Amino acid sequence: MSACNTFTEHVWKPGECKNCFKPKSLHQLPPDPEKAPITHGNVKTNANHSNNHRIRNTGNFRPPVAKKPTIAVKPTMIVADGQSICGELSIQEHCENKPVIIGWNRNRAALSQKPLNNNNEDDEGISHVPKPYGNNDSAKKMSDNNNGLTEVLKEIAGLDTAPQIRGNETNSRETFLGRINDCYKRSLERKLPPSCMIGGIKETQGKHVILSGSTEVISNEGGRFCYPEFSSGEESEEDVLFSNMEEEHESWDESDEELLAMEIRMRGQPRFANFRANTLSPVRFFVDKKWNTIPLRNKSLQRICAVDYDDSYDEILNGYEENSVVSYGQGSIQSMVSSDSTSPDSSLTEESRSETASSLSQKICNGGLSPGNPGDSKDMKEIEPNYESPSSNNQDKDSSQASKSSIKVPETHKAVLALRLEEKDGKIAVQTEKEESKASTDVAGQAVTINLVPTEEQAKPYRVVNLEQPLCKPYTVVDVSAAMASEHLEGPVNSPKTKSSSSTPNSPVTSSSLTPGQISAHFQKSSAIRYQEVWTSSTSPRQKIPKVELITSGTGPNVPPRKNCHKSAPTSPTATNISSKTIPVKSPNLSEIKFNSYNNAGMPPFPIIIHDEPTYARSSKNAIKVPIVINPNAYDNLAIYKSFLGTSGELSVKEKTTSVISHTYEEIETESKVPDNTTSKTTDCLQTKGFSNSTEHKRGSVAQKVQEFNNCLNRGQSSPQRSYSSSHSSPAKIQRATQEPVAKIEGTQESQMVGSSSTREKASTVLSQIVASIQPPQSPPETPQSGPKACSVEELYAIPPDADVAKSTPKSTPVRPKSLFTSQPSGEAEAPQTTDSPTTKVQKDPSIKPVTPSPSKLVTSPQSEPPAPFPPPRSTSSPYHAGNLLQRHFTNWTKPTSPTRSTEAESVLHSEGSRRAADAKPKRWISFKSFFRRRKTDEEDDKEKEREKGKLVGLDGTVIHMLPPPPVQRHHWFTEAKGESSEKPAIVFMYRCDPAQGQLSVDQSKARTDQAAVMEKGRAENALLQDSEKKRSHSSPSQIPKKILSHMTHEVTEDFSPRDPRTVVGKQDGRGCTSVTTALSLPELEREDGKEDISDPMDPNPCSATYSNLGQSRAAMIPPKQPRQPKGAVDDAIAFGGKTDQEAPNASQPTPPPLPKKMIIRANTEPISKDLQKSMESSLCVMANPTYDIDPNWDASSAGSSISYELKGLDIESYDSLERPLRKERPVPSAANSISSLTTLSIKDRFSNSMESLSSRRGPSCRQGRGIQKPQRQALYRGLENREEVVGKIRSLHTDALKKLAVKCEDLFMAGQKDQLRFGVDSWSDFRLTSDKPCCEAGDAVYYTASYAKDPLNNYAVKICKSKAKESQQYYHSLAVRQSLAVHFNIQQDCGHFLAEVPNRLLPWEDPDDPEKDEDDMEETEEDAKGETDGKNPKPCSEAASSQKENQGVMSKKQRSHVVVITREVPCLTVADFVRDSLAQHGKSPDLYERQVCLLLLQLCSGLEHLKPYHVTHCDLRLENLLLVHYQPGGTAQGFGPAEPSPTSSYPTRLIVSNFSQAKQKSHLVDPEILRDQSRLAPEIITATQYKKCDEFQTGILIYEMLHLPNPFDENPELKEREYTRADLPRIPFRSPYSRGLQQLASCLLNPNPSERILISDAKGILQCLLWGPREDLFQTFTACPSLVQRNTLLQNWLDIKRTLLMIKFAEKSLDREGGISLEDWLCAQYLAFATTDSLSCIVKILQHR
């Protein structure tokens, strides 16, 4: 077919299928039309269909959302369709419903090569199938309710009985795959209950978990593939549970199938390698822990991690519900499935549901039941009911285990994590491991019967934490099973705790429904209720809104729907509340969310679409979107994972949850749900709200749920999901507050937990709501709810203000404080959820306690706390700010005038408390200044505390997270800066005037016009500052600063003072001001778009040029568009020509001496003034952009590096760069190592000081020698009579001394450079351009000399990258590569990088675009940059003039966003310049020139050799990418200038390798895109062997070019086209003694055969030999020597003489104070000190034979 069977919306192309790029209309999913009715929609493939379906059939199931952008791959439902599998084993008609269970049974039984009870179960399953089938019928009816679309989907998915036919094929892989495919398709759209699960539950007891086809349980602890060991003992529990489940969920099969399929499709899930009881362990988790954290490996597992809950999934869930299938009514079953899936519950749940899920759920339900047992649908039913009902026992058990707070909810471990679906022994084992879970299902014989703890609660959703910092940091794996358990829990409405489905021991099927009828309803709606996890940060793509109607609508017994769909696991698709269907909130948001700027969906570090399909998918291409839930701080992956993990890895504590939640996503929506759950902790309560809650839970993204769930798990089991939703639905929540039904819909969009309205909202409504909710992510996270600024935010918050107040006040207060869930909603969802239900409200913020007050605040303090201008809903979502923002924003809620988001964020922030507040601040929003000011946005107290602490909040995700994307960042510099989430911090390269304070005020007033703009504006600078801080603490101020930063760069200091609001603010108060600026910056930034002119405050430093560091977070995340000005914003600005605001505030001293406590130690924080720092910290410093680098440790992505640096910078340590080293106090080269700058070569006194001068150096040697002599004097003087012995001693003494001298030389030349500096945004203000003329223009950047106030003795270079900000990802890649390397003399160091608005006059290469080529023009541009930049306070000092010039320019036009880097090495020219300028010299004195070339090549080889251990290949070695730094004997870096292109051989020039933008690094951090295609790549490509000797080859070309010869391959392109030999290479004229050696070296390096090409280390040896090694005479003698001994003696004697001569040279130089050691001396010492006879002979041979 032209169109694939299943329509998966393309992340980047909304209307098109990601698989076939055809419009949705063409995707009819023709196969199995009969099934379609059963299947709600293809879980994955039919995502769009399902979306439509859902939309149409709002009643039956949530309208399909465009497509939930979920981190998890859409499970390729094992199309084993429980049907096929079940059908085979049992009636295939029932396959739809029981397929999952049966599928398992079939996989185990039908496919059972292992007899396990699968066959019996199969029979039973078959017998049971009819029930499920009945359920299926009901499901079909439900589908009918849904619309013809459902039917179509079913057909496409083959949900009909048709798949049952395949049941007979059980044994054949094809059949198996066919069944799975059917199941898979059905599961995509299915609504049928997983009959397989129902059928196979009976024999669960006695079954053991089967790993890799083996029956033995790996361990309870959980290994990579570990399943709960309760296989026997627990199995019985599971049996009971399964029985209960069976009774209740006859629909489990579908769910199971889906889950199974999903799981299978997430093949490679095994990546949850280290599953632990509380981590990824399939083992039963502690009851109190809601989420299991699964460390995500870098592997595909990650995709599994977040199940891509498509609308189709929701539909499936809905379908199940319709079918009365207890599809995941029992949370346990679902949790089982989830476990299977290992990845987020949803995915597994869906997939598993269809197939794996069925067996898995069976297992889970069966507990002890082996997957084989799942075959019996009866058993399943029985167990299920038991699970549900008895589940109360089991659940209680599990519950107690699973959730401490919630009623005992059987915590079914999501053993699924490690499950492998395999058709081994006829068993279908979910193979989580395999990426192609589907294929693996049938392929691997491993029947991983994961005996999930029979707990209905099921395993907590796994929060997959990527231990390895996978590229897709945002991936959060949530265990669907937890969600299922949640559903199960929901079932037991009796239990107050939603989470613990088991909470309702009464209800036979906890998850399904309390009564059998309920169970039927459950079957019908249970699945429908399943919430779809949205793996998007701010919004849960599928807001599950339980529909009361769903409860009754079920064809099966119209049992009162489980109103409490306690989605234990936010991700679990469990239709916990049969009544609440997961209503995919169909909103542009969902579809967009997957891949929108806020999500970063599809942004580089995250693999967005996973194409792998299980074989059974059978080309029903269900593209798996793996848009990672992109939290605003998703890029801060570390923060996200931390948030998921929580401090303990489980967000058990509310605070933890909140913090985590905030960090993670806006998925805090879950919180909202949790609050609902919490509020109506009782199941009944939940039931009342159950639909909404349940739906809400569903709605919550998996990730959110995970966060919330983890957090909530400890708090209250029922709440977690809600909590999760809460984040998402924060905006929705607000709306909910306003109108519960509407709110619910909105909530649905924002967070499924908003399901409070018992009826489902229309998909369109939900979608619109979702859209609204999703858009908020645009606004700064901090004030997510504050204002309608974010597109969605406005919508969401439009109602929310009231709703928020209502919800905050009514529900927030009581529940939130206590329950984890309460806190969780802290995200965007918080407000809306709060609205939804008091609990939800309360839960809005994990620390909702503040939220509770928040309602009052909302009403009372809306003014005082103007919400951030545009706190993006996402910002709310970002867990960090969620707490504080919620607090603040709740306060602001009353004042809906401003961005509502602010309130929401405030609530979130508040809930989190100071830490959360800080975290809540979206780091991304931060402009450099904003960054700092933003901090102030946190609670002022928190701010103050943090400020005092001097910490931004650590990478742990406490305070620093800037996750929330900036709303609409219209700032110039942010516009580009935020180009990609992967981008690193951005700085605005601006010239700002000191009047910044005034500007800030103005900006603030503007920004606050909506909010408290007037307050801030009206206030005196101090008052303003304070207010700003307070507001900031509320997160609105921080937002304002962002905006200001971004848009208000206020006019250039001179002309555009108004444009430098940020500058002004920062400057005004210095510290407080900055904070104000930050606070203002966001709002202002927003307003600034319209009011940029308004920012009238004059730039404090009219002609100051400053770099503003938007902060990695900004750059990294899309939110960076509206960078906040952290308190250090001004500080951030690098003053190119003027003072930075910070400086002005600090002491108005040229150098802002008083850094915040951070000091250099922060590596770049030092520049920040303490107050600013405090404010930054207190505001939680949006500064650190988790996106970039939650932790310096994240090497996973370049983003990490930027993040870390910004994050760190903001953090107590300014982690300026990716690395943590920032903490070192050394960050700033201090006078201590005056040599700290590279120039230290022979740094004047420093050189001598550091080296103790040559003499001191010699002294040390002598001293060492003496030291040796004193203790060993006797030894030394022994054997004086023996000449040979004495010679040996002298030889060894010389060798040792030379080694020490070589090390000393390294210390001398690397003085101060061994410590990696990390300048954070706070340090920018301490930099000033010492000249407006570039000192060097390289291939990738232009360099300007700059001085650093804190290290006046050393010069620094400001590197302005030529690539546009949009292309800055390239630089970040380069940065990530470089930061993975240790410091090296010949590798350029990045001491700080930012995205900045750079005046065109500083961009010589911009000439073509801008008429201003001249310096003046550039200056004008610079002016513009200043004005336009988010007001960095340029340093007025030396830069004043240039600043002024810049100011003169038109800031808007002439500024461009570029990555600006601070480096220690000030290049004077490139090797290209050197070669060009040395043409004449080469002719005059070829010896000297070619020796110089050898020295440069030696340094190049030394640098390249340094890359090898790190598996880095530069791949772009060009003359223009090699920089030269001249060192004179004085030790000072020589001024640049081609005038002396070639330094004398005595003082060789230092060569630095730069521009790693094309570098290749072979590591586990492989681009997901590449990984995805590896299956089709040749080994040499996968292993990157083609790059292994690329640098060697390019070095060979450089030899020609440096000798003024053309590139042989440019001159003779045919050389490469044919198989050339070394003899074909052009000859190098022999002009000097070095020419012949260089010819040989070039031919060796250009060997066409890579395997024969010499290594760079050999090339280095050859160059050393050419420079200082044996000459021809020695070679001849060497050749004449017949024996090896003689040759070695010859070489040894030569070495001894050379070493002695070098020692003499060192001795002489020590007396020559003026001369000092030269670079050549050092290089020679390195050579002679470490040369050996072997190494020498090897090189001699190469030279002789080549």
From Swiss-Prot:
Keyword Cytoplasm: yes
PROSITE patterns assigned: PROTEIN_KINASE_DOM, PROTEIN_KINASE_TYR
Keywords, alphabetical: Cell junction, Cytoplasm, Cytoskeleton, Phosphoprotein
Biased composition (Polar residues): 355-364, 675-694, 748-758, 820-841, 889-902, 1440-1450
Oligomeric form and interacting partners: Homodimer. Interacts with BCAR1 and CRK. Interacts with PRAG1. Interacts (when phosphorylated at Tyr-1188) with SHC1 (via PID domain). Found in a complex with PPP1CA, PPP1CC, SHC1 and PEAK1. Interacts (when phosphorylated at Tyr-635) with tensin TNS3 (when phosphorylated on the SH2 domain); TNS3 also interacts with integrins ITGB1, ITGB3 and ITGB5 and mediates their association with PEAK1. Interacts with RASAL2 and GRB2.
Record note on domains: The dimerization region encompasses helices both from the N- and C-terminal of the protein kinase domain.
Name the UniProt record assigns to this protein: Inactive tyrosine-protein kinase PEAK1
Annotated source species: Homo sapiens
Gene: PEAK1
